[in-house]
């Protein structure tokens, strides 16, 4: 049988494989970047001009390097576990949402389902030290299904979406219209427990004047995430 024969050597591919291994080792030894927005800008530069297939591979490699070099990763919910495995590998530790948030307070990062029955994201209004700094999937055409929560947050990267919560009893359509009149593009993401979550186009700071008369008595920005 042909499979009993030793496969031919390919010195060129072997050299490329060794170069990849050496580059990954060197990158891990260098440690994580000091800021999440710096990491996002670097990844975006690497993805510039990449083909769709290349983009998936580069994001997966980048995510695994970040997971290995950065804080421990917690996952909460089935979708979060799937998305975390795709981006960061299988090292995420599963916990309920509230326990995941407590782990973030102690220095971890947590990827938490948006589809949770309880609006854990609303609790971030009362816990400003915790911030959404990423959302997966993170391409502009996809709706976020899970949020990466950290203590550090993310600054503007030039292509972002911001997450805003309100307790307004208005319909989502009416809220979107009101936000549009204020100069903000809002997209409803979730509603539970009397709270509504919206994605705002761009990087919107908590003190942005356009939010001054936003609908609702209890409102606030709970983070922002880059788009690739």
What are these regions (language model features)?
Residues 1-228:
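Domain-level signature for soluble enzymes in the chorismate/prephenate branch of the shikimate pathway
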